[in-house]
């Protein structure tokens, strides 16, 4: 009788392990389905700054939007900022999604390809700046990388996401102003 009880305990234990493993598969599949759905049905941008990760206060978003709006009126260059929650994209697909967002939203004037998208994921600890072809003629990928490394990341390391974003934005604007003259 004790052998049957022992066997029954082992059997129930194995079934519970199977249930745990299948739950992980369901969760992984659900997350991937959600991510694919987000990518296929991107929300329309509601302003220059689209904070889907809730990194900025309303006042901070307003300030970023005003700076970008004033710069766009001055130069016709469009800059969009998007923060992306880690549930909406895997770390491996972050760069691809940021390019997809830039293209889908049509950041920049179509005839000038003069758009810039700053994509941020606090959850994945990633940032990507996508420059349109017209912007690439004004400043290089190396200059973009320097802005990320020197103006943005030092603030992000201190969890100062608004300050880092603002610093990077102002450096991009300053660089573009000097290059356009």
Where are each of the predicted segments found?
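A structural boundary signal for the start of the first folded domain, especially the loop/turn
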Residues: 2-9, 18-117, 122-181
């Amino acid at each position: 009788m004790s052998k049957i009880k022992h066997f029954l305990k082992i059997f129930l234990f194995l079934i519970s392990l199977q249930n745990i493993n299948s739950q992980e598969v369901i969760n992984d599949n659900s997350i991937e389905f959600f991510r694919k759905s987000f990518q296929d049905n991107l929300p329309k941008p509601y302003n220059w700054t689209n904070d889907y990760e809730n990194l900025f206060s309303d006042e901070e978003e307003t300030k970023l939007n005003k700076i970008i709006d004033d710069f766009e009126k001055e130069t016709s260059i469009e800059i969009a900022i998007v923060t992306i929650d880690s549930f909406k994209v895997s770390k491996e697909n972050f760069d691809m999604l940021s390019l997809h967002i830039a293209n889908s939203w049509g950041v920049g004037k179509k005839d000038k390809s003069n758009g810039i998208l700053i994509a941020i994921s606090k959850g994945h600890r990633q940032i990507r700046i996508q420059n349109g072809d017209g912007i690439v003629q004004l400043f290089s990928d190396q200059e973009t990388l320097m802005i990320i490394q020197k103006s943005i990341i030092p603030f992000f390391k201190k969890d100062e996401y608004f300050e880092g974003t603002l610093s990077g934005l102002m450096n991009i604007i300053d660089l573009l102003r000097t290059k356009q003259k």
